[in-house]
C-alpha cells in the first residue's frame, strides 16, 4: 500500500450545501472536519502520502473549471508523477479505512477499481491512456464526462462493497442534519 498516493477530492463548489463541505464538522465527530476525516482514513489505510484536490488548503487546483471530479483527478495526475492513487470524496463521512482496503486488495492485479453503483472512492492505476482520455474528455464540451464512462473506457473493475451503507454522500443541509440525528454509529478508525 505504501506506493499509493491518497487524494481527497475537495474542489467542488458545494452549491447544494451552501457551505464548503470540507470545512463542515464531521456529523458524528465534531472534533474534526469532513476534510480531516477524509485525510485520516487515507492515512490509516496506509497511503504513502495524502494530497488535496482543490484550490484551498495548499491543494492542487483544478485545471478545468466546473468540470466535477474528473477535473480534480486529471489535475492531480498532471501534478504528481505516480502510478497509483486512491481518490476519496470529502463528503463521505461514514467511509473508513477498511472499506478502502477492499479497493486496494482488489486492485492488486494492477487494474483500477471502484465500488459498483457508486462513483467514488476510486483506486486508479495510471498509464498514458488514462491521462490521454481525461485530457481529451475535459477539453471538449460535447464529450461524456461521467465517471462511469471513464471507468468503462479504462476497463476499471467494479466490485461489491461489504458495507454499502457507508458510501453515503452529504450534499445538502438536510443530508447533514439527517446523519447528525441518526443514532450515533461507532466509526472505525
Where do the language-model regions lie?
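N-terminal glycine-rich phosphate-binding loop and ensuing alpha1 helix
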Residues: 2-55, 97-100
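Short aromatic/hydrophobic "clamp" motif used to bind/position activated sugar donors
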Residues: 85-86
Amino acid at each position: 500500500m505504501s506506493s499509493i498516493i491518497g487524494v481527497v477530492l475537495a474542489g467542488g463548489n458545494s452549491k447544494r450545501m451552501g457551505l464548503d463541505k470540507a470545512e463542515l464538522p464531521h456529523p458524528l465527530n465534531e472534533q474534526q472536519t469532513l476534510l480531516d476525516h477524509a485525510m485520516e482514513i487515507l492515512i490509516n489505510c496506509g497511503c504513502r502520502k495524502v494530497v488535496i484536490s482543490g484550490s484551498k488548503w495548499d491543494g492542487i487546483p483544478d485545471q478545468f473549471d466546473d468540470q466535477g471530479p474528473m477535473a480534480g483527478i486529471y489535475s492531480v495526475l498532471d501534478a504528481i508523477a505516480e502510478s497509483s492513487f486512491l481518490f476519496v470524496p470529502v463528503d463521505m463521512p461514514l467511509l473508513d479505512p477498511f472499506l478502502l482496503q477492499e479497493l486496494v486488495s482488489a486492485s492488486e492485479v494492477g487494474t483500477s477499481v471502484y465500488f459498483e453503483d457508486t462513483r467514488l472512492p476510486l483506486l486508479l492505476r495510471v498509464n498514458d491512456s488514462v491521462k490521454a482520455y481525461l485530457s481529451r474528455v475535459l477539453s471538449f464540451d460535447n464529450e461524456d464526462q461521467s465517471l462511469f464512462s471513464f471507468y468503462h473506457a479504462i476497463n476499471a473493475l467494479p466490485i461489491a462493497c461489504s458495507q454499502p451503507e457507508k458510501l453515503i454522500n452529504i450534499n445538502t443541509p438536510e443530508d447533514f442534519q439527517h446523519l447528525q440525528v441518526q443514532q450515533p454509529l461507532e466509526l472505525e478508525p
